[in-house]
Each structure stands twice: as structure tokens, then as C-alpha cells.
């Protein structure tokens, strides 16, 4: 009778490996399972972890090894049910300590699956998108206009200040000075008719200077004051043509003049008051000249006192170019203060 030998190993079992993954990964897996249970995230099929084979015998197709060494036939994988069952088995295995020698070995076909999967991208893509709620429309009258960033906030003349401050900022290209010389027409030459017109820009450069032939017969040339003589009318521009040329220059600009209403009357033209600056009615100039504010000072006297310059001298008469340039220089002396005054007290057209 043969002897039966038993080989028993009473040593300690092999130590268990540490839980797979770090704490951050376990936290992510926990959140992912929670989303899977709530239906926000579809369960993902992953390849089972690798374990050492218990037997050297090759496994046949469709069979998996058991712990006791026997082989068990496994059903063919299905599209959805196997994915759910495999993910369920993975969840149960992950909850327990990972014992590599108890998990089934993967097949060779499963080894071709990519091991690293960007779970974070799938996790974010599966989350429901948050819809932005539209803001409620405010009722009419409830909206408040915000105060301007660069401007006075506590002014009762905001509209007018914006109007005049915008005009004054464009003065170099939008401001001109005009002066006209007249001759006498009509009965006894008592009607003043335009015979010369000069326009200068903000810097005093001449924009227009022409002799103009009145539509009526000239009775008095008024040479002592106007400087106009008969020979000046030989090649003079007809009044209608000259008037159209002048009005094109004045259109949309601030027009400065001394007793400018006489010039507009000779042109048969009315310029907007908001764009008109008359140096004969600016009290600031009189104050600088130490004259009564309500007094009407002549252009000659203001130029002498404030600019220390003599104009309209001699017997040759006035020069409309010289007068227009002097008028512009006088206005520049009080330009800032007078524009602020007009912003607070805008004239009515």
C-alpha cells in the first residue's frame, strides 16, 4: 500500500497590495459612480486588471480560470448587458481590497484596449449644461442714465454744456472771423450794400477776400471808411455769386465778427445765434479794457487797448482783412470764459 504525503504550508498569506490609485482618483471614481446611479453618466466598459495566471495551461476560447484551477465557460459578450455586468463587477471588486491573485486574467484581445482613458473629459462632457437665465427687462421709467465718465455730474445745463464744449473743442477748424465793407446805394446812398468781404480762419489766414459788385447802382463809395474805389468794381464778383461762395464757407461754423449783424444784413443772411460770436457784445472784453460792460466799444479802441495795435489808420480807409484778423485775436482773449458762459446760458435761435 502506497504512502499518502500531504504538503501543508502554515506560513502567513501573501500581503495585500495597497488600494489602487491615489486619494484623488478614488474621489473621482466615487463621484463618477454617483453620477452613473443618477443617470447623468453612462457606465463605461473598461478592461479588467491583469493578474498572474494560476496555471501554465493556456485557456481556451470562451473559458476563464477559477480559483480552484478549473475552467468555466463564459457566455459571449453582449452589447449593453455585458457592459453593465462588467462595470457592476468592477464596482464590487473596487470596494474590496484589490487581491490580484483572485481576479481573472484578461484575454489577449482585451489587452489591445488603451489603458489610459481621459475619464475627466468624459466626466465633464456628461454633466448637464447649466442654462443661463435671461435678465428680466426693466420697466419703462425705471432705467437711470449713468453719469458721464468725464464730465460734470451735478449740472443743470448738461445738455447745453455738452453742446458748446463739443463746439469749442473743434474751434480751429470750425471757427472763422468775417468783416465786410459797404458802399451806399439807393436814394442818396443811404442803403448799405456789400462791396467787399473778407473771411479768415482761427489762425488769421485768409480764406476769402473779394470785391463784390452790388446789384444796384452805387451812389456813394464811402472810400474814407470802406476803402472802396470805382476801379475796384471793374472786375468785382457779382453779388449773387459771391453770396453763394460766402455762405458755403460759413455753413456749420462759428462766425466771429464785430457788430456782425451789419455784415449779415449786407449778405441778406441769418446765421444761427448759437454759432455767432459778436465781440461788440461780450462784457468780458470791456472788463479787460477797463470799460463799462454795457458799453458798445469800437473795434479800433478794443484793438488798441487789448492788443496794443493801431488799425483803421490813415486816409486810405479800412481793410476788411485787417479788421477780421483783429476780431479773431480779440475773441481768443476771452474764448474759454465766454464759451463756458454760453454753455450755462445758451442763446435762443
Curated annotation (Swiss-Prot):
Residue ranges for the region (Disordered) are 1-100, 126-166
Could you cite one Gene Ontology molecular function of this protein? Answer: exonuclease activity
Q: Biased-composition ranges for Basic and acidic residues?
A: 14-23, 54-66
Pfam families for the chain: RNase_T (PF00929)
Which EC class, in a word? Answer: hydrolase
Its subcellular locations are: Nucleus, Nucleolus
Tell me which residues make up the Exonuclease domain. Answer: 175-331
Q: What is its EC number?
A: 3.1.-.-
Free-text function comment from the UniProt entry: 3'-> 5'-exoribonuclease involved in ribosome biogenesis in the processing of the 12S pre-rRNA. Displays a strong specificity for a 3'-end containing a free hydroxyl group.
This protein's name: Interferon-stimulated 20 kDa exonuclease-like 2
Its source organism is: Bos taurus
From the UniProt record, report the name of the gene that encodes this protein.
Answer: ISG20L2
